[in-house]
Structure formats: C-alpha cells, structure tokens
Amino acid sequence: MDIQYLMRQAKKLEKAMADAKEKLAEIAVEAESGGGLVKVAMNGKCEVTRLTVDPKAIDPNDKAMLEDLITAAVNAAVEKARTAADESMSKATGGIKIPGIAG
C-alpha cells in the first residue's frame, strides 16, 4: 500500500470537507407550521436566519399554541437543514460516512 498516495488522498478529503463546511452557511431551507402561520428559515449550520409569525397566530390567551407552532417550525427546519448538510458533506467526501461531520 502506498502511504504517500493515502496521505495525498487524506489531504484532498480534508480540503473537500473544509470547503463543504464553509458552504453550509450558504444552504437555505425553510419550514412552516400551522398552515404557514409560523415560518422559519435556517442555513445548513442550523442557524435560524429568519422567523416570521402571522399576526393571526398571536393570541394573548393562547400563548402555548404559538409556542407549539414555533417549536414545530424550528424542528422541521432543523431536520431539513441537517438533511441538506448531510447531502452536501456526502458529496464532499464521495459518500464516505464520517460521524459527527454534518448536523
């Protein structure tokens, strides 16, 4: 086995992974709950970039409903962001699964 070759391949993989990680911020996903009453935009790093709440969802007497809608929208966005990040990292690594790299 050629150690030099393996080292070159490892360096290529390392660079591809670093490039892919940088691009995670460029990935954009959106999710909603309550039929669009709450919308969340998130990047591939699972950072919320926008949260919108329709005024119809704001009921001072039902704070729990709004909290549930926000939670559901954020969780849906996180799932989409993780999936998109996993796909991006998989492309960078040629399909090699590396635990803990994305999401």
UniProtKB/Swiss-Prot annotation:
Compartments where found: Cytoplasm, Nucleoid
GO CC entries: bacterial nucleoid; cytosol
TM region(s), chain numbering: none
Gene Ontology terms for molecular function: DNA binding
Domain of life: Bacteria
Gene3D superfamilies (UniProt xref): Nucleoid-associated protein YbaB-like domain
InterPro entries referenced in this protein's UniProt entry, alphabetically: YbaB-like_sf, YbaB/EbfC
Keyword set, alphabetical order: Cytoplasm, DNA-binding
Broad class of the protein's primary localization: cytoplasm
Range of residues in the leader sequence: none
Function: Binds to DNA and alters its conformation. May be involved in regulation of gene expression, nucleoid organization and DNA protection.
Assembly, per entry: Homodimer.
Family: Belongs to the YbaB/EbfC family.
Protein name per UniProt: Nucleoid-associated protein Adeh_3636
Organism of origin: Anaeromyxobacter dehalogenans (strain 2CP-C)
Phylogenetic placement of the source organism: Bacteria, Pseudomonadati, Myxococcota, Myxococcia, Myxococcales
